[in-house]
Design a protein with these regions (language model features):
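C-terminal, surface-exposed recognition/capping segments
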Residues: 1-44
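Serine-esterase "nucleophile elbow" of acetyl-processing enzymes
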Residues: 42-109
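A generic structural signal for well-ordered alpha-helical segments
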Residues: 74, 143, 189-190
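Cell-envelope and extracellular/periplasmic
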Residues: 84-89, 114-119, 123-124, 155, ...
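Glycine-rich anion/phosphate-binding loops
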Residues: 89-96, 126-136
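Conserved, well-ordered alpha-helix/loop/beta-strand core segments that scaffold catalytic motifs
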Residues: 110-115, 133-140, 144-153
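Catalytic His-Asp segment of secreted/periplasmic serine-dependent ester chemistry enzymes
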Residues: 157-267
Length: 267
């Protein structure tokens, strides 16, 4: 897979379409579902933030249940973050609602984090890491074209899927390494495009590339974070969003994000 630093030209936004019979991935890099140009509809839309939230978080169940499981119940309201997660969704399904959940809300920053449900084959089909990466890249380019700052969250660690059978998990014993490889692509892409990469994975993983037991919602889950896991993620997320928006009041947290000291020319 060859990564480039080219950005999407013009205002091309994903629109909801049928998951059946969608176009192949070579019709538009990273598409995987039908796109149409809505240039005529968006020329009248003002650029920049109006009254939107500081950040919209788009993702899967890890995003959806965050507010209910964190011990910091005012984390999202205090930081003006709007979570838009839907349990069980793949990156393809998440990208299909990018317009309604992100663009319509007009945030200053978009945080994109997904991938585990693709690798868990929630749609019943084998999935390559390149396909997941392509969907995430499309969302990132769409957000950047709209004028949003972009944060790409790593896929959190997982080396087994509790809702799949033991036979399935045995046949997918390389899951943890596949998550690592997906995150490598995401990090490299974020570096090339000047986006911020929020590295949840490194902070949450055990020595088997699974979710650390103390950060797992239950001992048998090992996919969804506990309150302690979300506390770690909150530090990483806030620092990432602050850096993406060049907040002069940003302070270091205990989490990790990519290459903070290399940024120059802040205004």
């Amino acid at each position: 897979l060859v990564l480039t630093s080219s950005s999407a030209s013009g205002n091309y936004y994903p629109v909801q379409g049928s998951l059946g019979g969608y176009s192949s991935y070579n019709s538009y890099t990273g598409a995987g579902y039908q796109l149409r140009c809505v240039r005529e509809q968006t020329t009248a839309m003002p650029k920049g933030r109006l009254e939107g939230p500081r950040a919209v978080l788009i993702g899967n169940s890890i995003t959806e249940v965050w507010q209910g499981r964190t011990d910091n119940k005012t984390f999202f309201s205090d930081n003006d973050y709007l979570p838009k997660g839907i349990s069980g969704q793949t990156s393809l399904q998440i990208s299909a609602r990018f317009y309604n959940d992100v663009i319509v809300n007009d945030p200053a920053c978009v945080v994109i984090a997904c991938g585990v449900n693709d690798l868990a084959e929630n749609d019943g089909q084998p999935c390559s890491i390149e396909r997941v990466f392509a969907d995430i890249r499309l969302m990132a380019e769409t957000g950047a074209a709209r004028g949003f700052k972009v944060v790409i969250g790593s896929t959190p660690p997982a080396n087994r899927i509790w809702w799949q059978s033991e036979e399935w998990n045995a046949a997918h014993a390389d899951l943890g390494q596949r998550v690592v490889e997906l995150n490598r692509l995401l990090k490299q892409y974020a570096e090339e495009r000047g986006f911020v990469y929020a590295d949840y994975h490194s902070a949450l993983k055990d020595d088997q590339n699974g979710l650390k037991l103390e950060y797992s919602w239950t001992p048998d889950d090992r996919v969804h974070p506990s309150a302690a896991g979300y506390a770690v993620m909150e530090k990483i997320l806030k620092k990432a969003v602050d850096k993406a928006l060049f907040d002069p009041n940003a302070t270091d947290g205990d989490g990790q994000i990519d290459d903070l000291d290399k940024w120059e020319g802040w205004e």
